[in-house]
Amino acid sequence: MSKRTLEGSHRKKVRKSGFLSRSQSPTGRRILKARRKKGRKMLVKY
């Protein structure tokens, strides 16, 4: 059997779109603010 085409790395996902990385950049903070305003249960996926 051949390998799957997409094998996501958990570490990469967390570093790119985790809570800490979101809260460190101005645009990321804007995303969190918008998700809080909308009433999202989960602010970030990881």
Swiss-Prot record:
Keywords: Cyanelle, Plastid, Ribonucleoprotein, Ribosomal protein
Localisation per UniProt entry: Plastid, Cyanelle
Recorded GO MF terms: structural constituent of ribosome
One Pfam family per UniProt: Ribosomal_L34
Region listing for Disordered, in residue ranges: 1-46
InterPro entries attached to this UniProt entry: Ribosomal_bL34, Ribosomal_bL34_CS
UniProt KW Ribosomal protein keyword: yes
Subcellular location, principal: plastid
Keyword Ubl conjugation among record annotations: no
GO-annotated cellular components: cyanelle; ribonucleoprotein complex; ribosome
Compositional bias annotation for Basic residues: 30-46
Superkingdom of this protein's organism: Eukaryota
TM ranges: none
Biological processes, Gene Ontology terms: translation
HAMAP family in the cross-refs: Ribosomal_bL34
UniProt family annotation: Belongs to the bacterial ribosomal protein bL34 family.
Protein name: Large ribosomal subunit protein bL34c
Upper classification of the organism: Eukaryota, Glaucocystophyceae, Cyanophoraceae, Cyanophora
